[in-house]
């Protein structure tokens, strides 16, 4: 029996993680959850799974859930804020922490979980992007597994199993291309949030949907892959694959290319991470090769989708530059969703902040938190948020 904590239990990945646990109750037990303010969903989770702990970040939501548990004589202990997140990430009985919160908020709980010897099922891209070197070194120090919970890195992880790192030539990360695949810059001037939120293949949260539309999501995955698999940026390639059947590939020096293929369904990488190193009975629709008419691959347009190009630049620059990129992107996406900037301005703001805030400093926890704060305060004042 594996005991699980889910950080971000009410979001897209968190909800699908609950689906996996629901179908594997003999092997997986939900011990603790966190959420921002979706108290109704938290109450439903408490009713069904009866976790020992629930954490709410927002004060009012915390009080509502706490009152519900008291009134209904439910034993779930309700905690709040970052202290609560860290507490449930370091519980002695927990084996694996699923980090599916969005943004920088997942960084400190993830590091604390690693220091407590927990395996990490990592769905929070930002953690590795801003502090990859620190996270990976901590994981090695404490002998814990960092298990990627996304289709691309989960695929690469599987393609590498049983092979030697020195035999790898290239990692090939596939991208659906998002809702604007094939469009040029001039065609994206009038894009509104509702257009960018319509992903052709995946059901995702709002922030990651916008990242997918700008190809920033793929840029973050390139930086993640660098840290997760120890591969240089020049050997990490992005290929647009609109069918989303091939989830990523590894090219070896003898010319062999190993690809992981499956129906596009996030429950597969979630299930694989939670049960690692074992495989369990499938919870997704099997891949039917007779129904696949063709598989196509294209080169990404980095001029139109500037954030992908900037992610490579930030990764190669290293230090705190990925943290600057990430902080600027989180704010820029929020500004776009609120109608305060245009779609193409997202890339412009990333470039502006990378130029303005770069400092030659090591990516320590203190440094990345500090530069992230600087970027957010600057954009906050600029756009009065």
From Swiss-Prot:
> What is this organism's lineage?
Bacteria, Bacillati, Bacillota, Clostridia, Eubacteriales
Q: Describe its function.
A: Catalyzes the NADPH-dependent rearrangement and reduction of 1-deoxy-D-xylulose-5-phosphate (DXP) to 2-C-methyl-D-erythritol 4-phosphate (MEP).
Cofactor(s) required, per the database record: Mg(2+); Mn(2+)
Q: Any idea what this protein is called?
A: 1-deoxy-D-xylulose 5-phosphate reductoisomerase
Q: Which SUPFAM superfamilies match?
A: 1-deoxy-D-xylulose-5-phosphate reductoisomerase, C-terminal domain, Glyceraldehyde-3-phosphate dehydrogenase-like, C-terminal domain, NAD(P)-binding Rossmann-fold domains
Query: An example of a Gene Ontology BP annotation on this entry?
Result: isopentenyl diphosphate biosynthetic process, methylerythritol 4-phosphate pathway involved in terpenoid biosynthetic process
Q: In which pathway does it act?
A: Isoprenoid biosynthesis; isopentenyl diphosphate biosynthesis via DXP pathway; isopentenyl diphosphate from 1-deoxy-D-xylulose 5-phosphate: step 1/6
Q: Which residues bind 1-deoxy-D-xylulose 5-phosphate?
A: 125, 151-152, 176, 199, 212, 217-218, 221
Q: Where is NADPH annotated to bind?
A: 10-13, 37, 124, 126, 205
The enzyme's main class, written as a single word, is: oxidoreductase
By which gene is this protein encoded? dxr
**Pfam families reported for this sequence:** DXP_redisom_C, DXP_reductoisom, DXPR_C
> What family is this protein classified in?
Belongs to the DXR family.
